[in-house]
Amino acid sequence: MSKIIGIDLGTTNSAVAVLEGTESKIIANPEGNRTTPSVVSFKNGEIIVGDAAKRQAVTNPDTIISIKSKMGTSEKVAANGKEYTPQEISAMILQYLKGYAEEYLGEKVTKAVITVPAYFNDAQRQATKDAGKIAGLEVERIVNEPTAAALAYGLDKQDKEEKILVFDLGGGTFDVSILELGDGVFDVLATAGDNKLGGDDFDQKIIDHMVAEFKKENGIDLSNDKMALQRLKDAAEKAKKDLSGVTSTQISLPFITAGDAGPLHLEMTLTRAKFDDLTRDLVERTKEPVRRALSDAGLSLSEIDEVILVGGSTRIPAVVEAVKAETGKEPNKSVNPDEVVAMGAAIQGGVITGDVKDVVLLDVTPLSLGIETMGGVFTKLIDRNTTIPTSKSQVFSTAADNQPAVDIHVLQGERPMAADNKTLGRFQLTDIPAAPRGIPQIEVTFDIDKNGIVSVKAKDLGTQKEQHIVIQSNSGLTDEEIDRMMKDAEANAEADKKRKEEVDLRNEVDQAIFATEKTIKETEGKGFDAERNAAQAALDELKKAQEDNNLDDMKAKLEALNEKAQALAVKLYEQAAAAQQAQAGAEGAENAGSTKADDDVVDGEFTEK
């Protein structure tokens, strides 16, 4: 069975891992980094992903960041003169990760386990699965990020039972999960979170502070300047990271804008104390989900054995202190917060292929599911933190006499009124026989699969008529749209491949021209006129093809030049070898003469007096 890669598709950074033997290994990207920025930019028709895209974010307006925050919505992003769905942009990131995983493995990759925040709703999970499909990946499993982290942490600790709390604060989302580990079973007891809280929010607090201070000093509002804002974002992210290791950092942005008197520079010092003050409300928001998860799991703090920190934002000292204060425990530092989720996803891939034995993952649904009933009430069928996969049925009836149809409004959330929860979808069961209200029996069944994706059916128990849908929110893509996007992605991949081949060819041509010119110069006056002239003629022809920008001609002329240059190099080598041999012969004769002279030397004894 082919390898199943594990992918952590993050808001700010992503990572890919694979199982090698019994160990999960992070695959470094082409730049040698173990995580890849979740950034996509477009330039001259080319799609650029990762570190290169992030580097040009300041100057390239066609750069898209933090697309994960838009997953599951109908919002589109404009770039490159087009509009893209969040699924398409995410697919470009996935395609890049898939590409360098294939380079590393030396084989085609078609299957993946992709992680999502535990608190992602159905629409967001479906969007993630669609992104995988567009990227040419069969998504074998969607796994919650804290659960994946627990897998990576606990794989070598199966001999002991323990309850762990996973505190996962990433770039754009926050989750808390409580799991029970023992005998190879990873049982999620409860999960809670906030999909609108992450490292980006901490960056924004610094940006707002810089904008306010600059306006106070110079009377100019930088928040209206797109290029200045991107520079502020980069500086804020760097300052945040610096303050994890030092208590004060200098922010210096020369020529940030211009005033009446000329260019203006932003220079300021940010202390950790000020940063903590700016972000106090964000840190405070992490506490309630911890308490809720513990309450839902029916556990007290004393029953938690370990606290695992996941996500780059857990390096913020104030966050670490808040976790300590809230749990009364020193967090476990045995896992890398940036890599552990992808590693856990790869382990789940190994469970699916059978490479990892005796491991069972029991995850939960993060939010309650139900339907709208009379009076706009939200009636739950499946409570949050129910182990998945699961199925639940309940019988309802009509609200009016002779009602011919019922509308099924499917919702996800925790609020008592339907209007306050997230709509997953609507469908209708028709042709209900005329009867007084309350008589027809309509059975509604919810199914949640192992990926947390919902399907619902409604059945008239009198007529046995049934209506069934897999939930597709207004942000969902049709099969036709996914197919079209897959074709676009394949075409882009082919175009990228051609572009790379073209760049490689141009580099080879430049290298060949340089090397041949050097060899021709070195062989001047050494008697290889025929070979030198042939190499020079081939060199001139290649230069002409280069000027004409004819790629096919360049390829043919490059081969011809390599052949002539090689013939010249052989002559040069032969001459050097002959000279070396002659020199060795001369030295041998000289040494022989020296030995003969040595025969006249008489040995004597030396006595110390």
Curated annotation (Swiss-Prot):
GO MF term list: ATP binding; ATP-dependent protein folding chaperone; unfolded protein binding
Gene3D superfamilies: 1.20.1270.10, 3.30.420.40, Actin, Chain A, domain 4 (3.90.640.10), Substrate Binding Domain Of DNAk, Chain A, domain 1 (2.60.34.10)
InterPro entries xref list: ATPase_NBD, Chaperone_DnaK, Heat_shock_70_CS, HSP70_C_sf, HSP70_peptide-bd_sf, Hsp_70_fam
The UniProt record lists the keyword ATP-binding: yes
Domain of life: Bacteria
Annotated function: Acts as a chaperone.
PANTHER family: HEAT SHOCK PROTEIN 70KDA
Protein name per the record: Chaperone protein DnaK
Organism name: Streptococcus sanguinis (strain SK36)
Organism taxonomic ancestry: Bacteria, Bacillati, Bacillota, Bacilli, Lactobacillales
Gene name linked to the record: dnaK
